[in-house]
């Protein structure tokens, strides 16, 4: 069994439980901190966040802007000169573990996070540490897929962090000191946080992990000044039955026994209180309509559908809410009654798209674990089209068995939590893909009160080749424009720039720049550890930088490290 097979078998058969040392809040290296340094740290206004898509200096949100396009509008680094890119500085964190942070840059100050909910403020020009916050965690936390953290967001003079033990923390942006802390949910019931908060209109938006633990998922808004809850939306409504759909979003039969499910529903009732539906990634925000768009993860237990009859709303769905109230507006379910963990985890992206008649309309796109990019009408969440498959598909939708059924894609996808990027000038979406053949085995078990609850296991198949892709898809046609094969599965994220480039990293440590129009590799660097984090870009001192974390990944077991690496031109 290769290292990826071992990782999948371990993580998804046994879960992921660590007992990290208890950490206390600190400002590390206080000799480096001074009032004069703090004075250089700028507040962030709502107007700046609203226009982040046009900002060629900063990188203000985890996916670049509220639309989550991951398109950076500066082009000082471009196809002609990217070969001259070199390391500007390397910052080493104190945590050598899975690194998924998306660096945030505000007027020359960078904020990054690490596993176990550490936050660092760094001088974006020199790589010098300004301050370090280490969250005080309880002695035992149970969570899926690694102790990751994907970043922070800044509004005003506060830095907002969601922690592994399910707390929301506001820090002083100049010092790293805690302003307030709010409990989101009980981690001993399986709730945890790895996503970056989204802050908009004085609200902090956050979802929750825990779909493998029998939670009831949600998205919530908290007051950015006080930490008090403003509204709550349960991603699992009290009636989760739905329409008894028999086909997936692409029209393929899912082999459901509807009568057996209805009989089971009559016996056990609706299991909405422990049906899962975590939200792994940030919502996109449409400022024009005051709506948010996010995707919802798998039902609990993952593989045993007999304990959860019905469509299991709103799992495996795109959902839109009113930003001010949290009220439901619309949804679209990709897979009803999912028993394969091929859920929706990569963040939704807002772009203008062509509808079925060829008219340009506001759209929302999502890259699924199924290997398709789905294109929706933003108004009502309806599906316009889906792309060609970016990865091999085989035996879809074969039901899991006690012996184990082979199906592609494996449970990681497709496209995992990795955010995609878009280039609006080319109508292209860029996604990184995984190809991991797996066996799906069902094994019924009762709800274990906050412990891992898969209802079976999905394990990589020994001896079968695993690989990845970087794929460019025209979202107005659904056609793949180009694809680059990689020797290992891809997880982490991607960045597109106005310089005609896309940047992406691999688990073997390679970080590369590609021509965004044809996929030709133009530059690469070996980081020594897995580059499994979304890159960011920024300008400081008149120079454009590309920055990325190189710390490996727990979920796919890539080599660990602790480096934040910034690159610039000679």
Identify the meaning behind each predicted range.
Residues 88, 128-132, 177-181, 230-232, ...:
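A structural motif specific to WD40 beta-propellers
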Residues 91-102, 132-153, 181-196, 234-282, ...:
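Extracytoplasmic beta-rich repeat domains
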Residues 296, 359, 434-435, 462-520:
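Loop/turn-rich, solvent-exposed surfaces of beta-rich toroidal or solenoidal domains
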Residues 59-63, 98-118, 143-167, 192-216, ...:
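Repeat-blade elements of multi-bladed beta-propeller folds
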Residues 8-20:
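Bacterial N-terminal signal peptides
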Residues 25-73, 237, 251-252:
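N-terminal pre-domain segments of enzymes
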Residues 68-185, 496-497:
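N-terminal cofactor/phosphate-binding cores enriched in small/glycine residues
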Residues 171, 217-228, 311-326, 380-381, ...:
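Beta-propeller blade signature
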């Amino acid at each position: 069994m290769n290292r990826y097979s071992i990782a999948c078998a371990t993580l998804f058969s046994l879960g992921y439980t660590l007992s990290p040392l208890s950490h206390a809040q600190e400002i590390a290296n206080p000799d480096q901190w001074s009032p004069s340094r703090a004075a250089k740290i700028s507040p962030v206004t709502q107007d700046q966040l609203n226009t982040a898509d046009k900002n060629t200096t900063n990188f203000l949100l985890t996916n670049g802007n509220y639309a989550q396009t991951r398109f950076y509008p500066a082009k000082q680094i471009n196809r002609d000169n990217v070969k001259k890119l070199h390391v500007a500085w390397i910052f080493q964190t104190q945590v050598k573990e899975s690194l998924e942070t998306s660096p945030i840059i505000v007027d020359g100050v960078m904020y990054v996070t690490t596993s176990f909910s550490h936050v660092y403020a760094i001088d974006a020009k020199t790589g010098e540490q300004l301050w370090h916050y280490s969250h005080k965690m309880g002695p035992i936390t149970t969570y899926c897929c690694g102790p990751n953290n994907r970043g922070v967001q800044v509004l005003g003079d506060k830095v907002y962090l969601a922690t592994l033990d399910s707390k929301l923390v506001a820090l002083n942006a100049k010092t790293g000191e805690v302003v307030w802390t709010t409990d989101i949910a009980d981690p001993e019931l399986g709730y945890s946080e790895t996503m970056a908060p989204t802050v908009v209109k004085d609200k902090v938006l956050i979802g929750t992990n825990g779909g493998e633990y029998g939670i009831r998922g949600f998205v919530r808004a908290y007051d950015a000044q006080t930490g008090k809850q403003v509204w709550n939306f349960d991603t699992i409504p009290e009636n989760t039955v739905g329409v008894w759909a028999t086909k997936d979003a692409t029209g393929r039969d899912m082999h459901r026994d509807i009568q057996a499910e209805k009989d089971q529903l009559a016996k056990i009732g609706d299991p909405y209180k422990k049906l899962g539906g975590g939200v792994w990634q940030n919502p996109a925000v449409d400022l024009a309509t005051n709506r948010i768009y996010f995707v919802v993860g798998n039902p609990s237990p993952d593989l045993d559908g007999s304990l959860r009859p019905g469509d299991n709303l709103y799992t495996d769905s795109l959902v839109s809410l009113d930003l001010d109230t949290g009220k439901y507006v619309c949804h679209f379910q990709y897979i009803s009654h999912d028993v394969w963990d091929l859920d929706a985890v990569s963040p939704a992206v807002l772009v203008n798209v062509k509808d079925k008649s060829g008219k340009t309309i506001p759209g929302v796109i999502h890259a699924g674990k199924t290997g398709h990019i789905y294109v929706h009408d933003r108004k009502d969440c309806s599906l316009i089209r889906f792309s060609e498959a970016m990865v091999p598909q085989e035996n879809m939708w074969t039901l899991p068995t006690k012996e184990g059924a082979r199906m592609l894609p494996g449970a990681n996808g497709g496209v995992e939590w990795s955010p995609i990027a878009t280039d609006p000038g080319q109508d292209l979406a860029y996604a990184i893909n995984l190809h991991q053949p797996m066996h799906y085995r069902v094994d019924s078990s009762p709800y274990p009160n906050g412990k891992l609850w898969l209802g079976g296991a999905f394990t990589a198949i020994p001896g079968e080749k695993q690989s990845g892709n970087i794929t460019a898809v025209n979202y107005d046609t659904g056609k793949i424009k180009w694809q680059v094969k990689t020797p290992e599965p891809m997880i982490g994220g991607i960045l597109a720039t106005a310089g005609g480039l896309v940047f992406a990293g691999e688990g073997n440590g390679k970080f590369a720049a590609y021509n965004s129009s044809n996929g030709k590799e133009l530059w690469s660097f070996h980081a020594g550890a897995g580059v499994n984090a979304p890159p960011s870009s920024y300008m400081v001192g008149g120079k454009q930088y590309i920055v990325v974390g190189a710390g490996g990944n727990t979920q796919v077991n890539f080599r660990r490290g602790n480096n934040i690496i910034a690159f610039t031109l000679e």
